[in-house]
Amino acid sequence: VLARLHSDECFDEMGLLKGGMQLIDEEKLLRIMSVFEGLETTLASGGSAANAVSGVARMGIESGFIGKIGRDAYGRFFREDMERNGVQTLLIEGEQASGCAMTMITPDGERTFGTFLGAAATLCAEELSVEMFEGYDILHIEGYLVQDTSLILRAVQLAKEAGLSVSFDMASYNVVKDNYAII
C-alpha cells in the first residue's frame, strides 16, 4: 500500500523513522492504516522475490511464486496481480492476515516502509512439496528468507530434487555477514 504524505509530521504518530524500513506488528499496522484513511493510496504487489518473478514473467519466461497469504483482500489482490503479470501462483492460505508493506512517500521524495510480514512469515518447511518446484529451471530465494534455516534448507533440497539451480538475492551486506555459514 503506497501513500503520498503531505508532511513528515505523522511519523511520530505511526511510530516510524523517516527513510527506514521497520518490521511492524498488527497493532502498528492498524495505526498506520488509520493515518492512511484520509490519503489517496495505491495497491501493488511486491517484495523483492515477487518483483523479480513478475519481471521475468513479463519477459515471457514461465514463472511461479511460492508463498503464503491470508484469506483477505490483500491476499486476493496479491494472487490476482501476480497472475495478471503472468506468474503461476503457488500460494498457501493461512489463518493470519496477509503481509503488506505500508509505503510512505514524503514531499521530498523519501520513502519509508512499515512492513507487516503477516501470513508470509508463517510459511514452514512442511508446507513445501517437490511438485511445487517441478517444471521450473531456477529457484530464486529472497535474502531475508535465510533467517528461517529449516525453510530455506527444505526449499533448496526440493529444488535440487526437481533439478533446479538455486539463485540467492542476498538483499544487503548484513544478511550475508549474519548468515554466512548457511549460505
Question: Predicted regions: what is each one?
Answer:
Residues 1-64:
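Glycine-rich phosphate/adenosyl-contacting loop at the front of the ribokinase-like
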Residues 1-19, 41, 81-93, 103-183:
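Ribokinase/PfkB-type carbohydrate-kinase core domain
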Residues 54, 58, 80, 157:
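Short, well-ordered alpha-helices that flank and scaffold nucleotide-derived cofactor binding pockets
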Residues 70-71, 96, 173-174:
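Conserved beta-strand edge residues that scaffold enzyme active sites
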Residues 45, 71, 148:
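Charged, low-complexity surface patches
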Residues 34, 63-89:
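A glycine-rich beta-to-alpha transition motif near the start of alpha/beta enzyme domains, typified by
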Residues 49-53, 75, 152:
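A general structural signal for well-ordered alpha-helical segments in protein cores
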